[in-house]
């Protein structure tokens, strides 16, 4: 039941909420988070995360069997209702400003029709969820047409875990449903081989009445379409070998296009075009020679005025000291079009870089784009002096940044924040890391902002101290590390540890209830006492608190409790911890190669202290070698008092009588997997502690092992979750497991980077795992699983769509086989390979329909329901599809059978 994430985000924060006791803790170095990610994901042989593994594993998962025992109504999406995730894509509908579309970086597309008071997810679970940009056709009569782009090059330190997308998607019904534009999808996700794998910006041309013109800022290139995305022509860019290739594009109301391309690319510079086809590089001669991402801000009330903010202009522009001893250079320029093609004397440039916020005594107050991760510039619709630039914070200038004197922080981190425990927080009811700004057409005092915490609104952007309202009301795009439930039967108490959004707690089963945040930072592993008042909450790098919460989840008292004798530099990013499964007074804690135990949690006093304490702690003297790291802990139910723990070097151990004295450890027989494999979880049968499953999370290693004798012997059970018998290939990263015994059988569950899988029948290396919840959370990453046997409550924590729960009285209803057997029905596809048509023959007298998918699971063609006539033959025209591998499924009575075919 221990967890990990897949998609790397390098930046994190801590929040402060109104009317709550909140301990404030600072960010940690991105380097530490990255090292943790690499260790648990990388191929132990090469030390690298396999190239483009996210796309490869999604393709691999397409062929795995799927269970449809439960429909959506059986699953309860618990939330967190009031918390959002990273949001780069955000637009207001020009037909109705109360209709907002927002896309999560890993959570899919959402739509609100009431100004953000509620949201509906409009992408299907099987569709693309990595949304990076969004635009609407604003022309009269065309307003129902929308486009979103996918894939996020986040400026991370680890290339292979950036969020690859797969092209552009289009809606013709106002954003209610979406289909991919086939020409922008590669259908070959084994390589970064498409310009549309990363998308930075999409813009339509509102001035062209005869053509459906859209511009796309992709990885190193600017593209243009005249037919709504059916075909594209490259306007700028070329063959680019660099990974980080940033672009941006903006279009004025009269069709003038501005585009930027980073300095390491072909056609680098700042470009202007009056027709979208003839381009002039207007970059001033004294512009910094080196720059990464350059964002564009057109002044709505005077579109001849354009601002450009450039990140990583090393040696030029404004130098700022950033938090944790970092530094960066940033440049801000204002351009005024005067005449002609805008070059030379046809445009006036003003360097405003010296007025970028810098040299503040509190390092969090200085401008920081975090290596191009968060960057924006925006001009108010009517007041040209109100200009906002965004990085970690929102900085507002009321004189257009012509001086440094009229600038203030209006969002992000709390002004005056600096390094050190208790010295920083977030701006009230807001979140750091800014990505998008919109203004309400009917009232341009109202501004809407998308950032790493979701969507927020202010009613008065001009106010000295800007007040924010969260619009994360069911905008379920949160990214979880862990979910923890009370041990009490039928209890609604639940904890969620969220990336960037702290430790959240709810006492209500209502999916629309507010989840309070008693402890900020990156929420990690937790324990809940049986009284449901005392909570043991941790954040990144091993900071642990005991907190007393009221029945709303608000903290009324606290005490830091991680051992004072521990060396904090030994803690992991997600430091292992587990509460004893039978005794809520006992907690186990790790410090690198050591295990600590607290046997009297209820005696820890609440002194509201932020100081570490040795009170009540003992450590086991039988520690591991100093170079070994403990990565997961789990305790038994029956028999009690057995502690299993795993390491980053594949080895696992067992301690009997773990809660008494100073017991020795026993090394378990090592499963036959590669050395330095990361032990992500050890699942224990609650009725028989000798039955365990070991989960290794690295790619290119065998992932799942099963033992019925307490780890003396092991059997491989990953089965069809591996592409090869050795674990190499494109199988997913396994993260967590559960063993759930019922009266007549046992259910085995595994959370992976491509969803949740289960089986009743372990058959060694031939085990068949079936995907569960495909229609609910699809192939979203499952980080953590929890189960309460007293009422059969299963909780699923996802990275991108929050927390789901379901009561499962037995395994049959959760895991029935809905695949049609080939023995029961004849289904042939021919010719294969093919070019323009595909034929299939079907022997059935029942109603049926067919669906064609590309490799990523996107529907590219489908039929209405038809009547089978015994021997049925169909011919389908597929001439509009690109060459590649496809799948055709025939659905009868809710069951399906699938064949693959290739288009040459």
For every predicted segment, state its role.
Residues 6, 820-830, 834-904:
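C-terminal outer-membrane/trafficking sorting elements
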Residues 18-811:
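Beta-propeller blade termini and top-face loops
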Residues 13-14:
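C-terminal motif of bacterial Sec signal peptides marking the signal peptidase cleavage site
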Residues 808-824:
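Low-complexity, Pro/Thr/Ser/Gly/Ala-rich linker/spacer regions in secreted
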């Amino acid at each position: 039941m221990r967890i990990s994430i897949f998609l790397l985000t390098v930046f994190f924060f801590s929040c402060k909420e109104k009317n709550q006791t909140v301990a404030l803790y600072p960010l940690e170095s991105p380097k530490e988070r990255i090292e943790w990610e690499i260790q648990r994901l990388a191929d132990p042989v090469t030390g690298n995360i396999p190239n483009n593994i996210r796309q490869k594993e999604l393709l691999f998962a397409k062929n795995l069997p799927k269970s449809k025992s439960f429909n959506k109504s059986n699953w309860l999406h618990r939330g967190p209702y009031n918390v959002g995730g990273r949001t780069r894509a955000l637009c207001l509908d020009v037909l109705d400003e109360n209709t907002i579309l927002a896309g999560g970086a890993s959570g899919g597309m959402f739509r609100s029709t009431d100004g953000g008071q509620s949201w509906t997810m409009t992408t299907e679970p099987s569709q693309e969820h990595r949304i990076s940009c969004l635009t609407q056709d604003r022309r009269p009569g065309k307003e129902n047409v929308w486009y979103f782009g996918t894939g996020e090059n986040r400026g991370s330190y680890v290339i292979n875990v950036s969020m690859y997308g797969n092209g552009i998607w289009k809606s013709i019904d106002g954003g209610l449903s979406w289909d991919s534009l086939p020409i922008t999808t590669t259908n070959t996700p084994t390589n970064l081989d498409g310009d549309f794998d990363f998308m930075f910006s999409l813009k339509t041309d509102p001035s062209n009445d005869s053509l459906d013109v859209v511009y796309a800022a992709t990885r190193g290139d600017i593209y243009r379409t005249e037919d709504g995305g059916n075909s594209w022509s490259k306007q700028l860019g070329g063959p680019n070998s660099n990974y980080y290739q940033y672009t941006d594009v903006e279009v004025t109301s009269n069709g003038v296009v501005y585009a930027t391309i980073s300095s390491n690319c072909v056609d680098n510079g700042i470009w202007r075009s009056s027709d979208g086809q003839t381009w002039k590089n207007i970059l001033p001669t004294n512009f910094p020679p080196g720059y990464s991402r350059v964002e564009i801000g057109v002044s709505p009330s005077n579109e001849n005025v354009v601002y450009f903010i450039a990140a990583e202009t090393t040696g030029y522009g404004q130098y700022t000291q950033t938090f944790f001893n970092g530094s960066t250079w940033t440049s801000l320029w204002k351009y005024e079009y005067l005449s002609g093609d805008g070059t030379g004397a046809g445009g006036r440039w003003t360097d405003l870089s010296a007025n970028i916020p810098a040299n503040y005594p509190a390092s969090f107050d200085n401008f920081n784009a975090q290596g191009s991760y968060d960057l924006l510039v925006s001009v108010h619709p009517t007041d040209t002096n109100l200009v906002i630039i965004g990085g970690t914070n929102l900085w507002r200038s009321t004189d257009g940044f012509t001086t440094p004197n009229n600038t203030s922080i209006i969002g992000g981190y709390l002004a005056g924040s600096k390094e050190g425990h208790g010295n920083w927080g977030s701006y009230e009811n807001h979140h750091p890391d800014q990505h998008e700004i919109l203004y309400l057409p009917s009232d341009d005092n109202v501004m809407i902002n998308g950032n790493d915490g979701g969507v927020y609104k202010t009613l008065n952007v001009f106010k000295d101290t800007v007040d924010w309202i969260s619009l994360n009301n069911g905008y379920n795009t949160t990214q979880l590390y862990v979910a923890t439930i009370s041990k009490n039967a039928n209890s609604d108490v639940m904890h969620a540890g969220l990336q960037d959004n702290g430790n959240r707690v709810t006492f209500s089963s209502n999916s629309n209830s507010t989840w309070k945040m008693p402890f900020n930072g990156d929420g990690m592993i937790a324990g809940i006492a049986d009284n449901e008042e005392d909570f043991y909450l941790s954040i990144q790098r091993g900071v642990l608190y005991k907190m007393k919460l009221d029945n709303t989840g608000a903290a009324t008292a606290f005490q830091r409790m991680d051992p004072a004798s521990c060396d904090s530099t030994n803690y992991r990013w997600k430091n292992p911890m587990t509460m004893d499964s039978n005794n809520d007074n006992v907690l186990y804690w790790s410090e690198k190669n050591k295990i600590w135990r607290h046997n009297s949690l209820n005696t820890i006093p609440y002194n509201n202290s932020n100081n570490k304490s040795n009170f009540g702690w003992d450590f086991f003297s039988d520690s591991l070698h100093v170079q070994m790291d403990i990565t997961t802990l789990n305790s038994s139910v029956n028999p009690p008092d057995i502690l299993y723990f795993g390491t980053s070097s594949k080895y696992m151990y067992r301690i009997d009588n773990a809660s008494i004295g100073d017991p020795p450890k026993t090394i378990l027989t090592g499963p036959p997997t590669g050395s330095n494999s990361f032990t992500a979880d050890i699942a224990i049968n609650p009725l028989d502690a000798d039955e365990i499953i070991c989960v290794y999370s690295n790619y290119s290693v065998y992932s799942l092992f099963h033992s019925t004798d307490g780890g003396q012997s092991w059997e491989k059970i990953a089965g069809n979750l591996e592409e090869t018998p050795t674990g190499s290939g494109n199988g997913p990263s396994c993260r967590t497991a559960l063993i759930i015994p019922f009266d007549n059988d046992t259910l085995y569950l595994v959370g992976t980077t491509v969803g949740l899988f289960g089986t009743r029948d372990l058959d060694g290396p031939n085990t068949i795992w079936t995907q569960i919840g495909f229609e609910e959370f699809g192939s979203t990453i499952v980080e953590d699983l929890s189960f309460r046997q007293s009422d059969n409550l299963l909780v699923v924590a996802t990275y991108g769509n929050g927390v789901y729960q379901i009561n499962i009285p037995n395994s049959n209803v959760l895991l029935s086989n809905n695949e049609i057997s080939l023995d029961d029905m004849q289904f042939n596809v021919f010719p294969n390979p093919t070019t323009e048509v595909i034929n299939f023959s079907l022997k059935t007298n029942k109603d049926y329909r067919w669906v064609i998918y590309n490799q990523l699971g996107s529907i590219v063609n489908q039929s209405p329901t038809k009547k089978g006539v015994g021997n049925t033959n169909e011919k389908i025209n597929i001439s509009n599809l690109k060459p590649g591998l496809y799948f055709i499924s025939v659905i009868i009575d809710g069951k399906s059978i699938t064949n693959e075919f290739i288009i040459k």
